[in-house]
Amino acid sequence: KMSNQEHIIDEGYIKYNINWINEPLKVSAPKQLMEWRDKMHELKQIGHYAEINIGYGNISVKTDGGFLISGTQTGDIYPIKSEDFTLVTDYNIQVNSVTCKGEIKASSESMTHAAVYEADKSINAIIHIHNPKLWSLLMDKVPTTKKEVPYGTPEMANEIFRLFKETKVKEEKIIVMAGHDEGIISFGKDLNEAGKILLNFLAKLN
């Protein structure tokens, strides 16, 4: 298991550059986005590690002007509110920088979401969960990033691009991040597609 220190670095306090435009969002988070986020929270796939005070997991959808993503350290909030999301309006993978607008910052994990959206323009929704059992089970059985590559880094974004070139990730719509303890992302043309992929795998665990 990771030490606390590694976990803190991993969750990105904040090893990336953020240009945060702190103002209320003009757009409100779609109902479906809030519903799927709360469903994942109820299933403990998105949440908060109380002992080290760090949130895990997040969810995003493409929208006009960028993508809406649950903000940093919102894992313990339930039910989620529209203002717990932030709009990523710009990013630069190579220098690990993000511009976001809203009342909350985007975490470094936004970079991985940006890479998935960039890799396949038909993708409109992404869910990132933590599940130790499923993570171990699916490792190398579904498209899997290299173990030495940490989450929320330019290297991870490049790993995502590699998987889209070299694997059937477009069909499978799920990625295990070997270098991000317990981390799994699913995606699809909408949240229902991304969510059902995860629910199907979770059902097999029981």
Where are these regions (language model features)?
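Glycine-rich flexible loops
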Residues: 2-206
